[in-house]
Every structure is written in structure tokens, then in C-alpha cells.
Curated annotation (Swiss-Prot):
Listed name of the protein: Large ribosomal subunit protein bL32
Matches recorded under InterPro entries: Ribosomal_bL32, Ribosomal_bL32_bact, Ribosomal_zn-bd
Organism in which the protein naturally occurs: Saccharophagus degradans (strain 2-40 / ATCC 43961 / DSM 17024)
Pfam families assigned to the protein according to its UniProt record, in alphabetical order: Ribosomal_L32p
Family recorded in the similarity comment: Belongs to the bacterial ribosomal protein bL32 family.
Gene Ontology MF terms: structural constituent of ribosome
Length: 60
């Protein structure tokens, strides 16, 4: 098993963890439907940049 040779300081631990923060996904609001969606992705209704690009079938 690997065992550290020297104890790492709080500063070194913090510097290592400085890049581990999570970021939320950037959401946009569609201009036509007002629905939130991921950037550069089609909305679940089939709209992209305010235009209907995909015909979505109803599952009901």
C-alpha cells in the first residue's frame, strides 16, 4: 500500500482542491416557447433558435 512520506500542509491540500469545484450547467430561455434548455441544444418541444426544427411525437 502507498504511504505518504511527508505530511502535506493545509495550503498544499487547498491548492490541489482548487480545481475540484462543480459548476452548474448554463441554461438559456427559448425566445418562442420561453422554455429553459441547454445552450446549443434543441428544446424538448423541437425548437432551436426560435424555429421548429424537429417534429416531436406525443407519447400520450
Amino acid at each position: 500500500m502507498a504511504v505518504q512520506q511527508n505530511r502535506k500542509t493545509r495550503s498544499r491540500r487547498g491548492m490541489r482542491r482548487s480545481h475540484d469545484a462543480l459548476t452548474g450547467k448554463t441554461l438559456s430561455v427559448d425566445s418562442t416557447t420561453g422554455e429553459k434548455h441547454l445552450r446549443h441544444h434543441v428544446t424538448p418541444d423541437g425548437f432551436y433558435k426560435g424555429r421548429k426544427v424537429v417534429d416531436v411525437a406525443d407519447d400520450e
